[in-house]
Amino acid sequence: MIKFEKVSRFADSDIEMPRRKTAESAGYDMVVAEDIVIPPYDSLYDSMAVNAATTDKPLTLNEVALITKSLKAKPTLVSTGMKCQLNKGTYLELSVRSSCPLKHWLILANGVGIIDSDYADNPDNEGEIFFQLINLSPVPIILHKGDVIGQGIFKPYFKTDLDEAIEIRMGGFGSTNA
């Protein structure tokens, strides 16, 4: 069964469940669970640039991750307060509203979000669905509880005939170290 549920920290909240607005809408509108400020991109860029300027060689992914972690310079995680139970062979694709970049200068940092069928109920974050946002404007932007931030679209996926993946998910974001 495919269904959205509130995560426990928002169980008593009056946030809207994701829903489609029209009969032919592919995506379920996802709302912001709590007020949050998205800092401007230049503040992230400036803090990264200062640390990266100490070297003239390209940085590895691990080096960038260490700088990012030490500076707490990363995209803003915007909670929907939701998790999603999915059938095997299905994933939930997240994208920002088409108006976000055009009208509000907000983009999804990872281009598209993928919620795997084994993400719900993981021990790190209960499978809470977040949008990773970057604010390209020169000023902070506040998102209010209930603002529609993006869409979730259910999609099937396929595996190769010789697929041998047997690991069990043990965490949330980045838990597979990919």
For each of these PLM feature ranges, what is it?
Residues 1-178:
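DUTPase catalytic domain/fold
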